[in-house]
Amino acid sequence: MKIMTRALSIFILFITFALTPTDADEGGVSFWLPGQYGSFAAIAPTSEWSLPMQTYYYSGSAESTRALTRGNLLSFGLDTNFAAQFFVPTYSPDKQILGARPGLSLTLLPGYAETSAKAAAELFPQKQSDSITGFGDLYPTFQLFWNHDMHNWMAYITGNIPVGSYNPNRLSNLGIGHGAVDIGGGYTYMDTKSGWELSATAGFTYNLENSDTQYQSGIDSHLDLGLSRSLTEQFFVGLVGYAYVQLTPDSGQPPALGDFKSRTSAVGPQLGYTFKAGSRSIFLNLRGYGEFSTKHRPEGGDIFITINIPLSRS
């Protein structure tokens, strides 16, 4: 009961933080994908080679009074849908670096995006729509994992290599058009006796300038949370949440947008299942988020379906 009370208290603090007034990234799109980390975020891989995969879908909209820069124009009443399949081949040698197990991965993704908006043209607003199918940017990541009994820690550095489908004159893009560096860490409390687990991952993103638009997004902060309870050895249920807050203003945006700091928060349910495929243990996780307290970016909901396949024996 004490564990559950503490965990619920953390989620209450998260909601309070998310609702605190704070003043966006270019076009309302950030390098960091909020919610990409959930439960068990700081648990080290048990296999030297593995293939985590995430199927992702997001649908959101911005109010007609909320301006975003898309396609080199101010856009209002933006509606957007985005679907992608993330492939994350991961190498984690059974060695120690600073007392931690290392992990190195590269994320690549095919995806689809569609966007419609009322663009502020020279004479009068015009309804425009756009869609794109292609590949996103590449995200290399290096991690270190520590473990002591029920406590687990993780440190990471990742970044964006802007090689994905991108055109500054389009409403829809799969790449973000600029480089970025993100540094952070995570913690997981996992009690195998009681079945309770709590994870938190936090970090900061520094965005490089987009050379096509001379626009530089500000420094971003983000927090991903996961709380779960195992009902059997294979099945668990729980809650997830995220908060995303831009700390410093953009540069290069139209003067009418002001400092254009973005933010969003979300909560939702999750469930997970572990099953055997031959000698391999396959991890499957489904989680969904509903966004609130959003500013200077679309607001909606997203779904993650995660599956982790070990490619070598533990």
Predicted feature locations:
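Surface-exposed strand-loop-strand hairpins of Gram-negative outer-membrane beta-barrel proteins
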Residues: 25-30, 59-84, 119-131
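Detector for outer-membrane/organellar transmembrane beta-barrel domains
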Residues: 152-159, 165-255, 266
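Residues on the lipid-exposed face of transmembrane beta-strands in outer-membrane beta-barrel proteins
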Residues: 42, 53, 87-93, 140-146, ...
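Residues that define the transmembrane beta-barrel architecture of outer-membrane proteins
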Residues: 47, 79-87, 129-138, 175-181, ...
